[in-house]
Structures are given as structure tokens and as C-alpha cells.
Swiss-Prot record:
UniProt-listed Pfam families: Formyl_trans_C, Formyl_trans_N
Organism per entry: Bartonella bacilliformis (strain ATCC 35685 / KC583 / Herrer 020/F12,63)
Gene: fmt
Catalysed conversion reaction: L-methionyl-tRNA(fMet) + (6R)-10-formyltetrahydrofolate = N-formyl-L-methionyl-tRNA(fMet) + (6S)-5,6,7,8-tetrahydrofolate + H(+)
Name of the featured protein: Methionyl-tRNA formyltransferase
Keyword Thylakoid attributed: no
């Protein structure tokens, strides 16, 4: 038996979940996504979210309210008379009236092993912290920030050089499988909900602009984790002296190199191996402003780097 659902999500991360629900035969009567955003150099063009584009391609009605706090929006949502709402990286607060409208409630696919990394940036924070594993959890939502009881979970290892983009892709597809499994159990009356532990709670705050600038006085290990966590968006950056002129460059790939540091900011000749506060790091992919992403060997053929800071 198919469930009557609403789907609420915004970025690319949520699209595989939407597709999985459709492939499982569920009736998605409406999709909610954040409003189109200005794009382009002048911000004159409005661009729809990946979820909105995916839903419209399947001829599913899409709603893009700025907020769900108004009585009008809450009445419109309640009128859908859905069995459940599936929420994946929607980015808009769900008030109590929205949470309680579906027959079985609202279910969120969250990219962490709760209660660790509640909040907006769980994938990035897990990599930054050097966590050895993370995962996806399906929880029934309540009014707290990612505090609802857990229906299903699955873990995955965080390898040394995996980027946020690569990990996000793996977790997105994992979440798609889990939500279909959870809804199948829900239909059969077999879904078990387990309260979250009161221990091990941590919060994954949004990434701040000042966190994206590389501080070469930190250890190579810490810098590498930040580069992986912020690749490709928003991307770490540093200033390089190229052809005698300072230039801001995005650093989008790295790996740890052997050897002790012989001086912060020192660059090894013929390589993009940079000495840090402790240890050395090899830059593998980087991007100058207005240019495409290059591997380090290609980059070095067209750029004479004399300093980094």
C-alpha cells in the first residue's frame, strides 16, 4: 500500500530521497522547497532549488513559502491530508502545527549518528573533528533541534581523504534506502521508535566565513581535515604570491605528506608541499579566481608560486 506523502527538501542531497520515494510507489502529493534564490554576478536571475527542479520534472506540485509560521501556510499544508511528511535538508523551521498535521507525523533523514552533530552542518563538522565514522538516521521529528526518536540508522566509515562532497553523496543514497525501509515498516505497523541518548550530544553549527581561511600555523592534520570538510563548497582558501603578486586561491584537495615542518609556509621546490605548524601537507587540487579547478601539477606549470600565507 502506498502512503500519501509530502516531501520537504532543498539541495542536491535531498534529490535521491525524492526519487527513491517515487520509485517505491508512494504518492507524493506536494513538494516543499526553499524559494528560488538570486544567482549570477548581478543577482538578477532567480534559480530554483535542485529539489524543485526534480519535482517539477515529475509534474509534482511545488510550494516555496518563505516561512511555514503563518496560519495560511499551515492550513494549506493540513489540507493536503498526508499520511506522513518526509523532510531532508529543507532548511526551514517546521512549527508544531506542521509537525502534527500528518497522520503519522514528520520523518527526517539526518546525516549524522545522533545525538552527535545535531544541526545544520553535520557532514562538515564530522570530518573537521576527525570522526572515524558517521551515518544516516531516520527520526520522527519533534519541536527540538534534531531531538526526535530514532526509527532506523546506518553507519559509514570516514576515510582519511574523503571530501564533504564525496561523503554527502554516499550518505544521500544511504538515506534514500533507509527512508523507504522506514516507511515500509510504518505501513505495516512495525516501525519502532527509540529515544535518543542523553549522552554524547553535540551541535553542528553552520560554517562561518572565517573558518574557510587556512591558518598555516595549525598542524597539517587539522588543515587537511578542514580542506576535506569544505570541499568543494564553500572551499578553503589562502593567499599565494604568484608571479610576484598576492592572489587568493581556493584549496580543494590535499593529502598529508611525510616529514617534519621546517618553517611555516615553506614550499618544497617543484611540488605543492607546504610546511605547517606541525607536519607537511601536499595540495592536490586548487582554483584561481575565475578559473577551473586544476590538479597541482597542471597548476604549477602555469604559476610560479613563491610564498603562501
Amino acid at each position: 500500500m502506498a502512503l500519501r506523502l509530502s516531501f520537504m527538501g532543498t539541495p542536491d542531497f535531498a534529490v535521491p530521497v525524492l526519487h527513491a520515494l517515487l520509485n517505491a510507489g508512494h504518492d507524493i502529493v506536494a513538494v516543499y522547497s526553499q524559494p528560488p534564490r538570486p544567482a549570477g554576478r548581478r543577482g538578477l536571475q532567480l534559480v530554483s532549488s535542485p529539489v524543485q527542479n526534480a519535482a517539477e520534472a515529475k509534474s509534482i506540485p511545488v510550494f516555496t513559502p518563505q516561512s511555514l509560521k503563518t496560519a495560511e501556510e499551515q492550513a494549506r499544508f493540513a489540507a493536503l491530508s498526508v499520511d506522513a511528511a518526509v523532510v531532508v535538508a529543507y532548511g526551514i523551521l517546521l512549527p508544531k502545527a506542521i509537525l502534527e498535521a500528518p497522520r503519522f507525523g514528520c520523518f527526517n533523514a539526518h546525516a549524522s549518528l545522533l545525538p552527535r552533530w545535531r544541526g545544520a552542518a553535520p557532514i562538515q563538522r564530522a570530518i573537521m573533528a576527525g570522526d572515524k565514522e558517521t551515518g544516516m538516521m531516520i527520526m520522527q521529528m519533534n519541536e527540538g533541534l534534531d531531538t526526535g526518536p530514532i526509527a532506523l540508522s546506518r553507519s559509514i566509515a570516514i576515510t582519511e581523504n574523503i571530501t564533504a562532497a564525496e561523503l554527502s553523496d554516499k550518505l544521500s543514497h544511504m538515506g534514500a534506502e533507509l527512508i523507504v525501509e522506514a516507511l515500509s515498516a510504518l505501513e505495516k505497523g512495525q516501525l519502532t521508535l527509540t529515544p535518543q541518548s542523553l549522552e554524547g550530544v553535540s551541535y553542528a553549527s553552520k560554517i562561518k566565513k572565517e573558518e574557510t581561511q587556512i591558518d598555516w600555523t595549525k598542524s597539517a592534520e587539522v588543515i587537511h581535515k578542514y580542506i576535506c570538510a569544505l570541499s568543494p563548497y564553500p572551499g578553503c582558501w589562502c593567499t599565494m604570491t604568484i608571479g610576484g603578486k598576492p592572489e587568493r586561491v581556493k584549496i580543494l584537495g590535499s593529502r598529508l605528506a611525510t616529514g617534519d615542518s621546517l618553517g611555516i609556509g615553506r614550499i618544497e621546490a617543484g611540488h605543492l608541499i607546504i610546511h605547517c605548524g606541525q607536519g607537511r601537507i601536499e595540495i592536490t587540487h586548487l582554483q584561481r579566481a575565475g578559473s577551473r579547478i586544476l590538479d597541482s601539477s597542471t597548476f604549477l606549470r602555469g604559476a610560479n608560486i613563491s610564498a603562501v600565507f
